[in-house]
């Protein structure tokens, strides 16, 4: 058997296998025996007709057809072993000739992606930390205070005053057309607005001051030239607002704030704590910006050759994540697809560009981790396990330790590599070796932002990469253990090395609509224009 290979784009290896006549004849013998056992041949009991009788009765072409599948599959497996080829996904038969010499067939075999990093250590990104001013601290303190507001119904109806909270129904129009059309008979959803010039776009705010409940406000506002929504940028937008209710917002006195925040200290000490949190958050945001920009530049300078199967797998992983989000809200994926008038395969196809970018990012991070030798040693893994179990109830520690040291060991390794990789990239990008100083898992946890919400984080995990010796999935709790995941974020799976003549299936979905609050619950925003000011959105 002679095997030749040719490298083709998209990580495809074209494998041509040439068979000798002896292999063909043996395969025909086996096929004849099978056919004589399956079919009635006049003058012979089943399984007793010799090959030449079977061939004369059914024809050589039928015999070849019976023989070809087993012959090709066996020869293909032998060729893979002979050449040391590990398929990344199912192979595809593209050409077959078993009727005359030379007997051969051609298979396209997806192989692991090729990633050639640039001189990534020559890429640098400055660390630019935003200054925390007194004004910034004042704003954060106002947010703290605002969290403890009490809403009170008005004793007597009166016009809305600055600081009040309005319950409204809003419709928005551009050029006379609604920005988000509703189905016939569908009610306009209710939402709430705080009557504050820093929270509502100019023009609309002024129109709402002084309105009474059960009043309609119809106002046209020129949106800013730099508005984040390009559909309304620099254009006139008509707002039709039905004011349903006006409530008074009662803010606590400043000296009550420490107790309300469960803070043991004075107001000045709470203010200082807030400043420190803002400084820490500003540094964290700057580090995130460096990380994102550095990885972007490395990706742009990296040479990739990715198999289509990797992109499809990544797209499927993204779609599974979104389906899980729908399920959490009691909505089945089938309901979403039906509403969109799309099939799952259509969505996967749409997701491919996003999936390819995510795959590239994961592969680049994986290759940097490998090049930098960030795989942890046994002592690091042991320390990580002990740090994790130390936070658990004592009676659960022994079982958790056993699980972390066995089934969940890859996740433990992943958490270590994630942190080391982030610090190494920041050190390379900024030229500041202090980022390499060891940090405990507790120190690596994300700080709470000064406004009380969780600090925004940048995902530094290595996803979208084929299974490798450097895994960087985030460490999971023992309770989260179930089926192992592959390093590309999907379920672990074995590669079918059989040949398939059909192409690999391909999948995408759109980002969910921006939501706003309706009676305290998140709902789909009926307007694509955000009535909030940029400052309010940062809260």
From Swiss-Prot:
Its EC number is 5.2.1.8. One of its GO terms (biological process) is protein unfolding. This is Trigger factor. Residues 163-252 form the PPIase FKBP-type domain. Residues 434-447, 475-484 have a biased composition (Low complexity). Involved in protein export. Acts as a chaperone by maintaining the newly synthesized protein in an open conformation. Functions as a peptidyl-prolyl cis-trans isomerase. The keyword Ubl conjugation does not apply. Residues 434-539 are annotated as: Disordered. It comes from Roseiflexus sp. (strain RS-1). GO terms for molecular function: peptidyl-prolyl cis-trans isomerase activity; protein folding chaperone; ribosome binding. Residues 509-528 have a biased composition (Polar residues). It is an enzyme of class 5 (isomerase). It is found in: Cytoplasm. Keywords: Cell cycle, Cell division, Chaperone, Cytoplasm, Isomerase, Rotamase. It catalyses: [protein]-peptidylproline (omega=180) = [protein]-peptidylproline (omega=0). The keyword Chaperone applies. Pfam families: Trigger_C, Trigger_N. Consists of 3 domains; the N-terminus binds the ribosome, the middle domain has PPIase activity, while the C-terminus has intrinsic chaperone activity on its own. One of its GO terms (cellular component) is cytoplasm.
């Amino acid at each position: 058997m002679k095997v030749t290979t040719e490298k083709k784009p998209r990580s495809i290896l074209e494998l041509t296998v040439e068979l000798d006549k002896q292999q063909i004849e043996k395969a025909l013998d086996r096929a004849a025996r099978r056919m004589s056992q399956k079919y009635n041949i006049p003058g012979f009991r089943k399984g007793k007709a010799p090959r030449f009788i079977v061939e004369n009765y059914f024809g050589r072409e039928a015999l070849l057809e019976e023989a070809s599948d087993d012959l090709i599959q066996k020869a293909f497996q032998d060729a893979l072993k002979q050449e040391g080829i590990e398929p990344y996904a199912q192979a595809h038969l593209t050409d077959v000739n078993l009727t005359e010499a030379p007997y051969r067939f051609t298979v396209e075999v997806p192989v692991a992606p090729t990633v050639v990093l640039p001189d990534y250590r020559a890429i640098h990104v400055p660390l630019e930390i935003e200054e925390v001013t007194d004004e910034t601290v004042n704003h954060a303190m106002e947010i703290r205070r605002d969290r403890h507001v009490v809403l009170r119904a008005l004793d007597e109806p009166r016009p809305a005053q600055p600081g009040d909270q309005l319950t409204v129904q809003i419709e928005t129009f551009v050029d006379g057309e609604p920005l988000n059309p509703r189905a016939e008979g569908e009610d306009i959803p209710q939402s709430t607005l705080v009557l504050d010039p820093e929270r509502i776009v100019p023009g609309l705010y002024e129109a709402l001051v002084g309105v009474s409940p059960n009043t309609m406000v119809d106002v046209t506002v020129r949106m800013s030239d730099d508005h984040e929504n390009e559909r309304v940028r620099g254009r006139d937008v008509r707002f039709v607002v039905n004011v349903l209710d006006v409530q008074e917002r009662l803010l606590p006195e400043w000296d009550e704030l420490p107790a309300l925040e469960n803070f043991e200290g004075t107001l000045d000490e709470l203010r200082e704590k807030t400043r420190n949190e803002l400084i820490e958050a500003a540094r964290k945001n700057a580090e995130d910006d460096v990380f994102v920009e550095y990885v972007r530049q490395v990706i742009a300078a990296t040479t990739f050759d990715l198999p289509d199967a990797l992109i499809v797998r990544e797209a499927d992983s993204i779609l599974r994540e979104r389906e899980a989000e729908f399920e959490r809200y009691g909505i089945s994926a089938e309901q979403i697809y039906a509403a969109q008038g799309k099939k799952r395969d259509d969505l996967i196809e749409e997701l491919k560009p996003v999936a390819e970018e995510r795959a590239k990012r994961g592969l680049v991070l994986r290759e940097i981790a490998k090049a930098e030798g960030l795989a942890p040693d046994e002592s690091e893994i042991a320390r990580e396990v002990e740090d994790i179990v130390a936070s658990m109830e004592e009676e659960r520690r022994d079982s958790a330790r056993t699980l972390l040291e066995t089934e969940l060991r890859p996740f433990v390794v992943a958490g270590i590599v994630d942190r080391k990789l982030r610090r190494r990239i920041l050190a390379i990008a900024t030229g500041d070796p202090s980022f390499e100083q060891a940090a405990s898992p507790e120190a690596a946890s994300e700080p709470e932002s000064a406004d009380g919400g969780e600090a925004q984080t940048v995902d530094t995990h290595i996803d979208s990469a084929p299974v490798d010796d450097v895994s960087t999935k985030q460490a999971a709790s023992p309770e989260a253990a179930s089926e192992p995941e592959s390093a590309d974020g999907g379920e672990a799976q074995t590669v079918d090395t059989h040949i398939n003549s059909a192409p690999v299936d391909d999948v995408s979905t759109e980002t969910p609509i921006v939501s706003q609050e309706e009676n305290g619950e998140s709902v789909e925003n009926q307007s694509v224009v955000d009535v909030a000011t940029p400052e309010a959105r940062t809260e």
